[in-house]
């Protein structure tokens, strides 16, 4: 009986620890390298993410198409899509790079937990980032909420933690729902 009790204790979440912390940490492992597409791809592969082909996941393909359509003939884009099972849910990681004809570039690193029904509590996100956000965007309960840190963990990029309710009009319009983590960097100007 003492062994069983010890195992149960070992499996419990530490009091005060966020149930979303593994997702937040998985995001930081890859997206801390947001200034380099190659570094993000390598970090994703090294940390157990599985790359998948364009078109293999309709929700991801829809987001990728929206991005390509926005770029049009104005520049080029490249990237990779990954997935990973974590805490019983499938997460999707998209790493991208865009460059326009003038040399302006942007890199992005995003994790989508499309099925999340509740946002990451502000206190958990603040604890994970180590400080309060520099901005909060909250256009309404039906649309969602975004916490923003500028800079992110250090100078040179931003970090966002968002939640889009399953009933949001953004789900119908863009395919967005659940928890979305974003890191972005820009340059070339």
Can you describe what each PLM-predicted range is?
Residues 2-12:
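Sec-dependent N-terminal signal peptides
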Residues 45-73, 126-144:
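Short secondary-structure junctions
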Residues 76-149:
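Long, charged/polar, surface-exposed segments that mediate recognition or autoinhibition
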Residues 15-42, 99-123:
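Terminal, regulation- and interaction-focused segments at domain boundaries
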Residues 14-24, 41, 55-95:
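Accessory recognition modules or surfaces
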Residues 134-189:
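Glycine-rich, aromatic-bearing surface loops/beta-hairpins
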Residues 26-55, 179-185:
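Short N-terminal secondary-structure initiator segments
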Residues 49, 82, 93, 109, ...:
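Hydrophobic beta-strand residues in large extracellular and virion-surface proteins
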């Amino acid at each position: 009986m003492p062994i069983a009790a010890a195992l149960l204790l070992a499996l419990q979440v530490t009091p005060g620890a966020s149930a979303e912390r593994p997702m937040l940490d998985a995001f930081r492992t890859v997206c801390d390298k947001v200034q380099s597409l190659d570094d993000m791809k390598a970090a994703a592969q090294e940390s157990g993410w599985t790359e998948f082909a364009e078109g293999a996941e309709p929700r991801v393909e829809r987001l990728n198409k929206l991005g390509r359509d926005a770029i049009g003939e104005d520049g080029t884009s490249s990237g990779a899509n990954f997935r990973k099972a974590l805490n019983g849910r499938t997460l999707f990681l998209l790493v991208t790079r865009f460059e326009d004809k003038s040399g302006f570039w942007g890199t992005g690193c995003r994790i989508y937990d499309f099925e999340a029904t509740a946002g990451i509590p502000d206190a958990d996100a603040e604890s994970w980032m180590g400080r309060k956000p520099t901005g909060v965007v909250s256009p309404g309960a039906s649309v969602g909420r975004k916490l923003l840190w500028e800079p992110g963990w250090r100078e040179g990029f931003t970090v966002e933690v968002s939640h889009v309710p399953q009933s949001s009009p953004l789900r119908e319009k863009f395919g967005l729902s659940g928890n979305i983590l974003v890191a972005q960097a820009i340059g070339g100007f």
